[in-house]
């Protein structure tokens, strides 16, 4: 499981690099500066939580056989958070349809849950 988590976190971080470059170079003449900022916020949070998923993977590697379900839940929540939070910001910026706005806080909630599960693992 740890290797899969490391693979997914690396792919997610790599995708964030691609999306960040796209925001900086490919979107300048296509969407407003405000929407580019929204898009880049999605990129930032995707980066942060890609690294968080890597921390989960490393924690599983350090723990050896003593693998915690809390870490698995942390990984799942970080992944869902990226999809909902960053994904909704990408869609909002690209389509400018406000319907995607309410999805963003749900992603934020999953980020918070991920950090709670990650923290609980280390205090148990």
Q: Where are the language model's segments positioned?
A:
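Polytopic transmembrane helical bundles with strong interfacial aromatic enrichment
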Residues: 1-124
């Amino acid at each position: 499981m740890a290797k899969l988590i490391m693979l997914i976190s690396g792919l997610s971080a790599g995708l964030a690099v691609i999306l960040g470059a796209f925001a900086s170079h490919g979107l300048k003449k296509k969407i407003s500066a405000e929407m580019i900022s929204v898009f880049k916020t999605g990129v930032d949070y995707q980066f942060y939580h890609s690294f968080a998923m890597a921390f989960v993977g490393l924690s599983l590697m350090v723990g050896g056989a003593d693998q915690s379900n809390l870490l698995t839940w942390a990984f799942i929540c970080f992944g869902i958070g990226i999809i909902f939070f960053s994904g909704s910001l990408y869609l909002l910026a690209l389509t400018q349809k406000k319907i995607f706005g309410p999805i963003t806080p749900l992603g934020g909630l999953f980020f918070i849950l991920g950090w709670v599960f990650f923290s609980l693992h280390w205090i148990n």
